[in-house]
Amino acid sequence: NVKWLYANKGNCEIVMKIPKELITEAQQQEFFDVFGDYCDRISLENFAPCWPQFDVEEKTGIKITEGIYNQPITRTDTCPYIFYGMSVNADGLVSSCFLDWERRLIVGDVREHSLREIWNSTEFNDLRLQHLEGRRNEHPVCNNCGQLTHCLPDNIDPYQPVLLERFKAHLASR
């Protein structure tokens, strides 16, 4: 029960969202009316092609013309997520990306290494360098990432030169 969850959430943030393309305006209002008092944030989002192997437009018949938050669709060189997140799968394999459902971006295994070791691993840092050096397009998975064109909350491209310099200095100091 969502009402119970919200009342007992503690420090957990409850976020409600739904794709707006498949529901009517009346259903959109109903969504806000039903869930608005039982969450910290609520929103309607656009469909986004986050997974390269899944064609959202083909599956839904809806042409995607804006980003998930109604922003313009733009290409970026650098993924911000790899600098503040990673995903631990149920089997202990660690991916550099929360969208890596096919497990093509594995950077470690928590059964063999600590999260700190994986976070600071050569594999993970090489991926970060590739992005900071503007070579994301060379990566077989990251190259076609719809998350970065359609869903990006943080664009760090304007800071890419200084971040690259600082990241290289950080790696050299270790």
Positions of predicted regions on the chain:
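Nucleotide-sugar-dependent
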Residues: 75-77
